[in-house]
């Protein structure tokens, strides 16, 4: 048993990434996830409860739902246990975040981009290559060219990450190392490399 919270519980994950007072942690992680694409400077947490569109349909409660300062809507989920049809569930979640953007009256169908970031403490598809990250976009099947940038899913399969602390070469890998081992750590690694990891430690000490 380590000093820090277990991020694979609903409470632990939302405490880590879902609090307004510590939203810099989520901003930092998202920037390290999307490094080289664009820089997020702020996020606004949105209502994570999505009501059904028609009576008798199922509603959705996201773990974390936010909008960036550049307009992307981002769903962040932690799934601890293996679940059948998880790919379909992820598609359903993003689809609802898209259809909820529809406006009454005159509307030109312009959409905000919707990203889904799915942490999984299991292997999603044993027939696929054992990679830590699977990045899904809408692209042309023949050319591979991006067709529409309004839909993106990033699946992070934690069991496929096997690097030791001194083998982590990027800040994204450092985040994944910390998340995978957090509830067994006695100290927060990588503090000398990036200030956000010290902030992360200070945030978690308050509940340890």
Each PLM stretch: what is its role?
Residues 1-208:
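Elongated, amphipathic alpha-helical interaction scaffolds
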């Amino acid at each position: 048993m380590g000093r820090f919270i277990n991020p694979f519980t609903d409470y632990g994950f939302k405490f880590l990434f879902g609090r307004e007072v510590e939203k810099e942690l989520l901003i930092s992680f998202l920037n390290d996830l999307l490094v080289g694409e664009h820089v997020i400077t702020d996020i606004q947490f949105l209502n994570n409860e999505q009501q059904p569109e028609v009576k008798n349909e199922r509603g959705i409660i996201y773990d974390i739902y936010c909008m960036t300062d550049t307009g992307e809507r981002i769903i962040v989920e932690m799934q601890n246990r293996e679940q059948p049809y998880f790919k379909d569930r992820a598609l359903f979640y993003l689809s609802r975040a898209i259809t909820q953007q529809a406006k009454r009256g005159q509307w030109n169908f312009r959409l905000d981009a919707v990203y889904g970031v799915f942490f999984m403490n299991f292997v999603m598809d044993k027939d696929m290559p054992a990679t830590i990250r699977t990045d899904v976009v809408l692209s042309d099947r023949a050319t591979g060219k991006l067709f529409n940038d309004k839909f993106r899913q990033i699946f992070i399969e934690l069991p496929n990450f096997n690097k030791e602390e001194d083998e982590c070469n990027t800040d994204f890998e450092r985040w994944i190392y910390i998340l995978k081992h957090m509830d067994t750590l006695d100290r927060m690694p990588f503090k000398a490399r990036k200030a956000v990891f010290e902030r992360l430690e200070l945030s978690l000490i308050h509940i340890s």
